[in-house]
Amino acid sequence: MANSKSAKKRALQSEKRRQHNASRSSMLRTYVKKVIAAINAGDHATATAAFAVAQPIVDRMATKGLIHKNKAARYKSRLNAKIKALVA
Protein backbone atom coordinates (compact mmCIF):
# COMPACT_ATOMS: atom_id res chain seq x y z
CA MET A 1 0.00 0.00 0.00
CA ALA A 2 1.21 3.49 -0.85
CA ASN A 3 2.32 5.49 2.17
CA SER A 4 3.30 8.88 0.79
CA LYS A 5 0.98 11.33 -0.92
CA SER A 6 2.85 11.07 -4.22
CA ALA A 7 2.82 7.26 -4.12
CA LYS A 8 -0.94 7.29 -3.54
CA LYS A 9 -1.39 9.64 -6.47
CA ARG A 10 0.77 7.45 -8.71
CA ALA A 11 -1.25 4.37 -7.67
CA LEU A 12 -4.50 6.14 -8.59
CA GLN A 13 -3.07 7.33 -11.91
CA SER A 14 -1.77 3.86 -12.68
CA GLU A 15 -5.16 2.26 -12.01
CA LYS A 16 -6.92 4.89 -14.11
CA ARG A 17 -4.47 4.29 -16.98
CA ARG A 18 -4.84 0.51 -16.65
CA GLN A 19 -8.62 0.71 -16.99
CA HIS A 20 -8.36 3.12 -19.93
CA ASN A 21 -5.84 0.87 -21.70
CA ALA A 22 -7.98 -2.22 -21.02
CA SER A 23 -10.94 -0.50 -22.65
CA ARG A 24 -8.91 0.48 -25.71
CA SER A 25 -7.37 -2.98 -25.96
CA SER A 26 -10.83 -4.54 -25.86
CA MET A 27 -12.05 -2.15 -28.56
CA LEU A 28 -9.07 -3.06 -30.75
CA ARG A 29 -9.73 -6.79 -30.38
CA THR A 30 -13.43 -6.26 -31.16
CA TYR A 31 -12.71 -4.50 -34.46
CA VAL A 32 -10.12 -7.10 -35.48
CA LYS A 33 -12.57 -9.90 -34.62
CA LYS A 34 -15.23 -8.27 -36.83
CA VAL A 35 -12.84 -8.43 -39.77
CA ILE A 36 -11.92 -12.05 -39.01
CA ALA A 37 -15.60 -13.01 -38.69
CA ALA A 38 -16.34 -11.49 -42.10
CA ILE A 39 -13.36 -13.31 -43.61
CA ASN A 40 -14.48 -16.64 -42.11
CA ALA A 41 -17.98 -16.04 -43.48
CA GLY A 42 -16.43 -15.57 -46.92
CA ASP A 43 -18.02 -12.15 -47.39
CA HIS A 44 -15.49 -10.00 -49.27
CA ALA A 45 -17.54 -6.76 -49.20
CA THR A 46 -18.20 -6.92 -45.46
CA ALA A 47 -14.60 -7.91 -44.73
CA THR A 48 -13.29 -4.98 -46.79
CA ALA A 49 -15.65 -2.55 -45.04
CA ALA A 50 -14.74 -3.90 -41.59
CA PHE A 51 -11.03 -3.69 -42.44
CA ALA A 52 -11.43 -0.06 -43.56
CA VAL A 53 -12.90 0.73 -40.13
CA ALA A 54 -10.36 -1.35 -38.18
CA GLN A 55 -7.22 -0.12 -39.95
CA PRO A 56 -7.14 3.45 -38.52
CA ILE A 57 -7.98 2.10 -35.07
CA VAL A 58 -5.03 -0.31 -35.21
CA ASP A 59 -2.80 2.58 -36.29
CA ARG A 60 -4.13 4.79 -33.50
CA MET A 61 -3.44 2.15 -30.85
CA ALA A 62 0.12 1.84 -32.15
CA THR A 63 0.55 5.63 -32.00
CA LYS A 64 -0.80 5.71 -28.44
CA GLY A 65 1.65 2.98 -27.42
CA LEU A 66 -0.95 0.33 -26.66
CA ILE A 67 0.63 -2.04 -29.20
CA HIS A 68 3.98 -1.93 -30.96
CA LYS A 69 4.05 -0.40 -34.44
CA ASN A 70 5.38 -3.66 -35.89
CA LYS A 71 2.46 -5.56 -34.36
CA ALA A 72 0.06 -3.06 -35.91
CA ALA A 73 1.73 -3.55 -39.29
CA ARG A 74 1.54 -7.33 -38.86
CA TYR A 75 -2.19 -7.18 -38.01
CA LYS A 76 -2.93 -5.06 -41.07
CA SER A 77 -0.77 -7.11 -43.40
CA ARG A 78 -2.21 -10.47 -42.37
CA LEU A 79 -5.82 -9.28 -42.43
CA ASN A 80 -5.35 -7.66 -45.83
CA ALA A 81 -3.73 -10.83 -47.21
CA LYS A 82 -6.68 -12.91 -45.99
CA ILE A 83 -9.15 -10.48 -47.58
CA LYS A 84 -7.28 -10.63 -50.89
CA ALA A 85 -7.28 -14.43 -50.71
CA LEU A 86 -11.10 -14.38 -50.63
CA VAL A 87 -11.22 -13.04 -54.19
CA ALA A 88 -8.61 -15.41 -55.60
From Swiss-Prot:
Pfam families per record: Ribosomal_S20p
GO cellular component, one term: small ribosomal subunit
Coiled coil: none
Top-level taxon: Bacteria
GO molecular function per UniProt: small ribosomal subunit rRNA binding; structural constituent of ribosome
BP GO annotations: translation
Region (Disordered), start-end ranges: 1-26
Basic residues: compositionally biased ranges: 1-21
Keywords: Ribonucleoprotein, Ribosomal protein, RNA-binding, rRNA-binding
Family: Belongs to the bacterial ribosomal protein bS20 family.
HAMAP family, A to Z: Ribosomal_bS20
Function per UniProt: Binds directly to 16S ribosomal RNA.
Protein name: Small ribosomal subunit protein bS20
Lineage: Bacteria, Pseudomonadati, Pseudomonadota, Gammaproteobacteria, Alteromonadales
